[in-house]
Regions:
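Basic nucleic-acid-binding interfaces
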Residues: 1-116
Length: 116
């Protein structure tokens, strides 16, 4: 869905993937559900659209919509940094993410859209 700011129309979606430190398969059960809630909170706070969350035992897939003012690396920084901080403050077990991540764009632009 096309959204708008004062000066721009946009449809920006990012597929973001990252893993826990040492790729430990620990993102299951209560941890998985807690992280889903935390990612939703972060997206609400930062005016992002959380389209889809898929948490596997050893990695996280997020599909996030964002206004054009936010560069992809900033989104990853928010999602990894804030989620680890919130999780570690609220629960006894600890979450640490690796420094690496994957981010790709997703969306569709037709010839008609370019011509307009």
């Amino acid at each position: 869905m096309v959204k708008s700011t004062r000066h721009a129309k946009y449809e920006l979606y990012y597929h973001i993937v990252f893993i826990p430190k040492y790729r430990e398969p620990r993102l299951m059960g209560a941890t998985k559900e807690r992280l889903k809630t935390i990612f939703a909170e972060i997206c609400d706070d930062k005016d992002l659209e959380l389209v889809e969350v898929e948490i596997m035992p050893d990695h996280v897939h997020l599909f996030v919509g964002s206004p054009p003012r936010n560069e992809p690396s900033l989104l990853v920084n928010w999602l990894k940094g804030i989620s680890a901080r919130y999780y570690n403050q609220r629960y006894d077990d600890r979450i640490k993410w690796t420094r690496s991540y994957y981010v790709g764009t997703a969306g569709s632009v037709s010839k008609d859209t370019v011509e307009q």
